[in-house]
């Protein structure tokens, strides 16, 4: 229904539906300024865009907004949802034809690698192939199948470009918005994921910028304008300088001891959010490796919303503190039990 609404709305405005998006699930209380702020952060990877209109949907009791783009975009760049007021807003767009979308993403990849379509076909041995002609005069129905067959044998690594694990979202806002991470946990996750990517630094930088919103995005955008060849390492170093913790063990320790579980946060998520800070303290020598498990447990108990963590996990006073994996296992087992009890209670309430 929403895709049909997008098509009908664009037809009424004489617009190309592939140069527009529909954002659904917007609370009626959100004004134009609220919507534009969310769009600026959530649709940053798409480049220039503008809010064209709003409409109230009675069946959802929510607003939808029509967003205009300057160019057609591929499915790899369009987020399925964006964090905003009232939770997350859904993003609906008209997917390109399969062949055209394939070629669009392939061209983006080649551009990032500094190659042209003609160079690619020559590398594959098709020196006299019509693919070496001007791409503008070739139709996708001819070009895409030939490229797909060649790539299946010669360019399997490029699938890393087409399918990859996206980074979590970071904006630099304090406190973080819905769906956003604090810097330490975001940096830890980003560093781990980037190790798995077998792509060029240019593509890594694009994926990094894709994960940024708000102030963090603006900082890197300005840096990239001033230095188009800025590296991923330089981007991360800048973000760490601005948003990271001061390189001071005492300041780091204060941050660690004042990091508490959020009201709606699972205890297991709190432990994982705390871990990068703890590991930094160990690296700085502020906490000895021999007592890291005890230090972790002490802060989890002190920072948890419920103060009966030790008893609920069956950890007697004076007993050795469990390691990270063992602690997470205990916590997740307890969370699973609690969810089962809640589910059972809901079912009983439904049946009575």
Curated annotation (Swiss-Prot):
Mod. after translation: Ubiquitinated and degraded during mitotic exit by APC/C-Cdh1, this modification is inhibited by TRIM39.
GO aspect biological process, one term: extrinsic apoptotic signaling pathway via death domain receptors
Record keywords, A-Z: Apoptosis, Autophagy, Cytoplasm, Membrane, Mitochondrion, Mitochondrion outer membrane, Ubl conjugation
Tissue: Widely expressed, including in the brain. High expression levels in testis.
GO CC annotations on file: cytosol; mitochondrial outer membrane; nucleus
Positions of the UniProt region annotated as RASSF1-binding: 204-207
InterPro entries the UniProt entry points to: PNMA, PNMA_C, PNMA_N
Main location: cytoplasm
Region BH3-like, residue ranges: 120-127
Covalent S-S links between cysteines: none
Domain of life where this protein originates: Eukaryota
Motif mapping: LIR: 49-52
A GO term for molecular function: ubiquitin protein ligase binding
Subcellular locations according to the entry: Cytoplasm, Cytosol; Mitochondrion outer membrane; Extracellular vesicle membrane
Domain text: The protein is evolutionarily related to retrotransposon Gag proteins: it contains the capsid (CA)subdomain of gag. The BH3-like domain is required for association with BAX and for mediating apoptosis. The three BH domains (BH1, BH2, and BH3) of BAX are all required for mediating protein-protein interaction.
Family stated for the protein in its record: Belongs to the PNMA family.
Assembly description: Homodimer. Under normal circumstances, held in an inactive conformation by an intramolecular interaction. Interacts with BAX. Binding to RASSF1 isoform A (RASSF1A) relieves this inhibitory interaction and allows further binding to BAX. Also binds to BCL2 and BCLX. Recruited to the TNFRSF1A and TNFRSF10A complexes in response to their respective cognate ligand, after internalization. Interacts with TRIM39. Interacts with RASSF6. Interacts with ATG8 proteins MAP1LC3A, MAP1LC3B and MAP1LC3C. Does not interact with ATG8 proteins GABARAPL1, GABARAPL2 and GABARAP.
PANTHER family noted in UniProt: MODULATOR OF APOPTOSIS 1, PARANEOPLASTIC ANTIGEN
Role, per record: Retrotransposon-derived protein that forms virion-like capsids. Acts as an effector of BAX during apoptosis: enriched at outer mitochondria membrane and associates with BAX upon induction of apoptosis, facilitating BAX-dependent mitochondrial outer membrane permeabilization and apoptosis. Required for death receptor-dependent apoptosis. When associated with RASSF1, promotes BAX conformational change and translocation to mitochondrial membranes in response to TNF and TNFSF10 stimulation. Also promotes autophagy: promotes phagophore closure via association with ATG8 proteins.
Name of the molecule in the record: Modulator of apoptosis 1
Native organism: Mus musculus
Lineage, highest ranks first: Eukaryota, Metazoa, Chordata, Craniata, Vertebrata
């Amino acid at each position: 229904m929403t895709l049909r609404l997008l098509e009908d709305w664009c037809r009424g405005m004489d617009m190309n539906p592939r140069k527009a998006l529909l954002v659904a699930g917007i609370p009626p209380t959100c004004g134009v300024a609220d919507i534009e702020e969310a769009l600026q952060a959530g649709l940053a990877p798409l480049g220039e865009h503008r809010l064209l209109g709003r409409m109230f949907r009675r069946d959802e009791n929510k607003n939808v907004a029509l967003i205009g783009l300057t160019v057609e975009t591929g499915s790899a760049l369009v987020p399925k949802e964006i964090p905003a007021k009232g939770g997350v807003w859904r993003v609906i767009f008209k997917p390109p034809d399969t062949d055209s979308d394939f070629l669009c993403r392939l061209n983006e990849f080649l551009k990032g690698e500094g190659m042209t379509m003609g160079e690619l076909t020559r590398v594959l041995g098709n020196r006299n192939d019509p693919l070496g002609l001007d791409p503008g005069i070739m139709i996708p129905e001819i070009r895409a199948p030939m490229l797909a067959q060649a790539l299946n044998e010669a360019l399997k690594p490029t699938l890393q470009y087409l399918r990859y694990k996206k980074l979590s979202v970071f904006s630099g806002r304090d406190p973080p918005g819905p769906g956003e991470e604090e810097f330490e946990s975001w940096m830890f996750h980003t560093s781990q994921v980037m190790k798995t990517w077998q792509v060029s630094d240019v593509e890594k930088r694009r994926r990094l910028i894709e994960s940024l919103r708000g102030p963090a995005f603006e900082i890197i955008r300005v840096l990239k304008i001033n230095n188009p060849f800025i590296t991923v390492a330089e981007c991360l170093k800048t973000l760490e300088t601005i948003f990271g913790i001061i390189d001071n063990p005492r300041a780091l320790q204060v941050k660690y001891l004042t990091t508490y579980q959020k009201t709606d946060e699972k205890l297991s998520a709190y432990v994982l959010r705390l871990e990068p800070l703890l590991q930094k303290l160990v690296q700085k020598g502020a906490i000895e490796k021999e007592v890291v498990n005890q230090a972790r447990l002490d802060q989890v108990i002190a920072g948890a919303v419920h103060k009966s963590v030790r008893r609920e996990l069956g950890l007697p006073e004076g007993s050795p503190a469990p390691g990270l994996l063992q602690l997470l296992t205990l916590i997740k087992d307890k969370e699973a039990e609690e969810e089962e009890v809640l589910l059972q209670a809901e079912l009983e309430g439904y049946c009575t």
